[in-house]
């Protein structure tokens, strides 16, 4: 009931704020402010006009509090919670005002409000002695994991940590509503992972589904999300059931041929359709959560090896066009975004290299020349010899050794000597007698696209990712780590 009332306050505040924004942009003083030539004076005038219309964080907070008071339902939500709902509206509206996001949308009753929070342990109060949340006179016990991490994060019963933000979150898990409490505590969080210093460097070569990693003492080649499989067959069956349900409930919305009628139509949804819709959403949620967990574990393993990460700038839109399902399942762009965010929070470095200038897939440090290769050729002949190295691994090695935006052949050779033996053991480097002449390129293109893994996916899951997945893979993943992160005493397949 309180969350539904919070949704109405959110929509009322957003509607009023959008109306004020329209009036402000149509006003004469707003248009005249853009005629001011000096940038600092123009920005100051625009900010003054915006404050006059109440379009700032505290203005929308007061607006939401007034809507709460006028509703006559002050017993459902407190003054503090209403103000923070206004702050949430401002964060959405601010992106729209400064052209960093689209027009904010109203929250429907079906979608609802997902969270409510308060700062300073007021309104929504966390009681550490009771391990409970107290809100509007009700006490809600929390199920807290009794682990060392939670004990250190929350503090002891005698000296609990001060709560900065207490947030109640509503989630749909397994087609049921679940309620969680999120706490932001004062101070530094407990250390879960010890990251390497920034003096250590690792190079990444990120593809639509896999990532190659090379540093002077570590090399790896794995899927971005080994267990982030999307159950396409189940999704297809659910969508067919939903389509049949819609046809049964809305026969007047279809032509005799079976096509939907053009124009605006009113669709009736049965309870069975709503149940199928929740099941479909839960399938996508499971895949997204598994993908997020795999990305986080892989990022932690990367930063445990090196504090500086070099990678090429990539056109992720091209991946979506050419490798649609792989891009959706593995989410390489999301992986890079989380990698940058983790590096920023941990005071580490992620360097994006110029792809057009360095041309990793074409360069050969032995001859210091550039040779274009077709996409299907996944092996590189090192210096024109009979030594073949995986194209992805070699690109990651080149990225690791970039100095001042240029290739450094001396550093590349030193790194190559350090990891060559391990790469041979894992099958990423091969010595094959190659034919000469035009048959050479044809032979390279016909080689297996990916090398055989040096270790089983179960071993990598145990040693690298450290957690068990709730989604079992439906195919055999080729995953390999060599160097520090894996036991290289095992013999390759």
Label each region the model flagged.
Residues 29-43, 104-122, 261-262, 268, ...:
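Amphipathic alpha-helical surface "interface" segments used
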Residues 25-28, 41-46, 53-57, 67, ...:
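Short, flexible helical or helix-coil boundary motifs
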Residues 2, 9, 13, 81-92, ...:
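Stable alpha-helical structural segments in soluble proteins, enriched in small hydrophobic residues
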Residues 21, 111-115, 215, 402:
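Residue-level detector of alpha-helical segments with a strong bias toward transmembrane helices
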Residues 10-21, 93-100, 210, 407:
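A generic secondary-structure signal for well-formed alpha-helical elements
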Residues 35-174, 329, 333:
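Acidic carboxylate diad motif detector
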Residues 2-53:
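Detector for conserved single-position "signature" residues within domains
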Residues 179-493:
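Positively charged, helix-rich recognition surfaces that bind polyanionic ligands
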């Amino acid at each position: 009931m309180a969350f539904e009332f919070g949704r109405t306050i959110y929509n009322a505040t957003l509607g009023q704020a959008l109306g004020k924004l329209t009036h402000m942009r149509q006003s004469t003083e707003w248009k005249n402010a853009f005629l001011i030539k000096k940038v600092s004076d123009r920005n100051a005038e625009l900010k003054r006009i915006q404050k006059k219309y109440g379009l700032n964080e505290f203005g929308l907070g007061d607006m939401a509090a007034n809507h709460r008071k006028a509703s006559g339902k002050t017993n459902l939500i407190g003054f503090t919670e209403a103000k923070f709902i206004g702050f949430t509206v401002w964060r959405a509206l601010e992106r729209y005002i400064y052209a960093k996001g689209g027009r904010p949308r109203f929250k429907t009753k079906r979608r609802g409000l997902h969270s409510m929070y308060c700062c300073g342990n007021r309104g929504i109060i966390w009681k550490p002695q009771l391990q409970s949340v107290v809100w509007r006179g009700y006490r809600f016990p929390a199920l807290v994991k009794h682990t060392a991490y939670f004990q250190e994060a929350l503090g002891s019963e005698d000296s609990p940590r001060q709560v900065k933000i207490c947030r109640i979150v509503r989630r749909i898990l397994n087609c049921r509503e679940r309620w969680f409490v999120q706490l932001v505590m004062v101070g530094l969080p407990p250390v879960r992972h010890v990251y390497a210093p920034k003096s250590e460097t690792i190079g990444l070569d990120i593809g639509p589904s896999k990532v190659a990693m090379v540093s002077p003492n570590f090399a790896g080649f794995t899927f971005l999300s080994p267990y982030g499989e999307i159950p396409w067959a189940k999704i297809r069956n659910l969508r067919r059931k939903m389509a049949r349900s819609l046809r049964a409930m809305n026969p007047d919305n279809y032509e005799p041929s079976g096509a939907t009628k053009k124009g605006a139509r009113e669709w009736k949804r049965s309870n069975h359709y709503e149940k199928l819709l929740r099941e479909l959403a839960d399938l996508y949620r499971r895949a997204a959560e598994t993908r997020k967990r795999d990305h986080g574990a892989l990022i932690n393993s990367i930063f445990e090896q090196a504090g500086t990460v070099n990678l090429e700038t990539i056109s992720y839109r091209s991946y979506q066009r050419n490798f649609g399902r792989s891009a959706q399942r593995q989410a390489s762009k999301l992986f890079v975004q989380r990698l940058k965010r983790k590096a920023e929070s941990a005071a580490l470095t992620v360097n994006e290299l110029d792809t057009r200038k360095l041309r990793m897939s074409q360069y050969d440090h032995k001859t210091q020349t550039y040779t274009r290769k077709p996409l299907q050729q996944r092996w590189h002949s090192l210096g024109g010899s009979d030594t073949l190295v995986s194209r992805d691994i070699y690109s990651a090695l080149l990225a690791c050794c970039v100095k001042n935006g240029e290739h450094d052949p001396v550093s590349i050779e030193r790194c190559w000597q350090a990891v060559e033996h391990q790469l041979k053991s894992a099958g990423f480097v091969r010595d094959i007698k190659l034919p000469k002449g035009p048959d050479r390129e044809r032979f390279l293109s016909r080689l297996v696209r990916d090398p055989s893994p040096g270790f089983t996916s179960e071993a990598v899951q145990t040693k690298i990712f450290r957690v068990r997945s709730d989604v079992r893979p439906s195919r055999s993943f080729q995953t390999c780590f060599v160097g520090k992160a894996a036991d290289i005493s095992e013999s390759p397949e």
